[in-house]
């Protein structure tokens, strides 16, 4: 199970390992289309309601794999506002293929026209907080209809990490998420499909452009159970001990002290509020000061 932040790390690591975001979007879209085919009958109408990010891009791809259905794609916004280059490429592919792709330029102009299936691809795992417009109005329209609703990655309006909604949220009948389950999906009253989209296992354990492998912690642990580290340095410069201390926090130690000259103590503290800064007398570190520093 991966949190939204951890999933972003895995995506970045996969790209560094040679699996491009474009490849992942193609695989994700194909996975969405497979779930739609499971819930729809041949000839059914399918409306894909899409955001302007990668989540919407997944649905643009899915639309190309749904030629057996009466498909309409509703982009919540203008084409020019689509944030990702690969998503814009897939929007252009829809237009080139003469698939019914519409720009929804204000929340009142969304017309779903009573489809049999709705694909909710407005917002993905990285979104938090209450839905804004036009997504809020679109979510209400989806919920008020009688269609089977398939959400991409997570129902829009639901926090992927907590399962909570800060306001209106899409009421999904099915959810298709990618690579691994997300913590917030366990609370949903809907079947969840976890689709393998070709992310290598090394993306979870290799340090690349994303981040270090996530750390597993006992939720009943106390501060200090995961290491106490003392960083000694500074004077007249603060960068080295401050960066070393911050890096130590990121690797998982939860009590990190930085012993540095008083002249740079405030600067070091400003790098991260999680650092415990011990201000030592003088402008440089010497043997006498080290003896007074402690973890």
Q: Which residues does each PLM region occupy?
A:
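YjeF_N-associated NAD(P)HX repair module
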Residues: 116-230, 235-236
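Structural alpha-helical scaffold elements that stabilize or flank donor/cofactor-binding regions
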Residues: 110-112, 168, 289
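Short glycine-rich anion-binding loops that position phosphate/pyrophosphate groups of nucleotides
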Residues: 52-54, 79, 107, 122-129, ...
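Small-residue (G/A/S/T)-rich helix-start motifs and N-terminal tracts that mark the onset
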Residues: 1-68, 72, 182-294
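Short, hinge-like loop/turn segments at secondary-structure boundaries
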Residues: 89-92, 166-170, 273-279
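Nucleotide and nucleotide-moiety/phosphate-recognizing core
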Residues: 34-122, 132-151
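Short, conserved active-site loop motifs that form the nucleotide-linked donor/cofactor pocket
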Residues: 99-100, 173, 192, 275
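Short, hydrophobic beta-strand segments that form beta-sheet elements in well-ordered domains
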Residues: 102-104, 151, 175-178, 257-260, ...
């Amino acid at each position: 199970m991966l949190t939204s932040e951890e999933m972003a790390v895995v995506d970045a690591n996969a790209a560094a390992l040679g699996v491009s975001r474009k490849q992942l979007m193609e695989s994700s879209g194909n996975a969405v289309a497979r779930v739609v085919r499971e819930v729809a009958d041949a000839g059914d109408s399918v409306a894909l309601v899409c955001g302007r990010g990668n989540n919407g891009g997944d649905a643009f791809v899915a639309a190309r794999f749904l030629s057996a259905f009466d498909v309409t794609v509703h982009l919540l916004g203008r084409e020019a506002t689509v944030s990702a280059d690969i998503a814009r490429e897939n929007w252009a592919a829809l237009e080139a293929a003469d698939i019914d792709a519409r720009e929804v330029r204000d929340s009142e102009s969304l017309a779903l026209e009573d489809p049999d299936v709705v694909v909710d691809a407005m917002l993905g795992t990285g979104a938090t907080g209450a839905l804004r417009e036009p997504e809020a109005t679109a979510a209400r329209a989806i919920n008020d209809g009688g269609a089977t609703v398939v959400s991409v990655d997570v129902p829009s309006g639901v926090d992927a990490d907590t399962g909570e909604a800060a306001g209106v949220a899409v009421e999904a009948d099915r959810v298709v998420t990618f690579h691994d389950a997300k913590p917030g999906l366990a609370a949903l009253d809907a079947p969840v499909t976890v689709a393998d989209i070709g992310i290598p296992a090394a993306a979870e354990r290799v340090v690349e452009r994303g981040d270090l492998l996530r750390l597993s912690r006992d939720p009943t642990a106390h501060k200090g159970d995961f290491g106490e580290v003392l960083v000694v340095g500074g004077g007249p410069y603060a960068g080295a001990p401050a960066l070393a201390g911050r890096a130590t926090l990121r690797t998982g130690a939860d009590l990190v002290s930085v012993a540095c000259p008083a002249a740079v103590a405030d600067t070091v503290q400003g790098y991260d509020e999680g650092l415990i800064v011990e201000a030592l007398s003088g402008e440089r570190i010497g043997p006498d000061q080290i003896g007074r520093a402690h973890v």
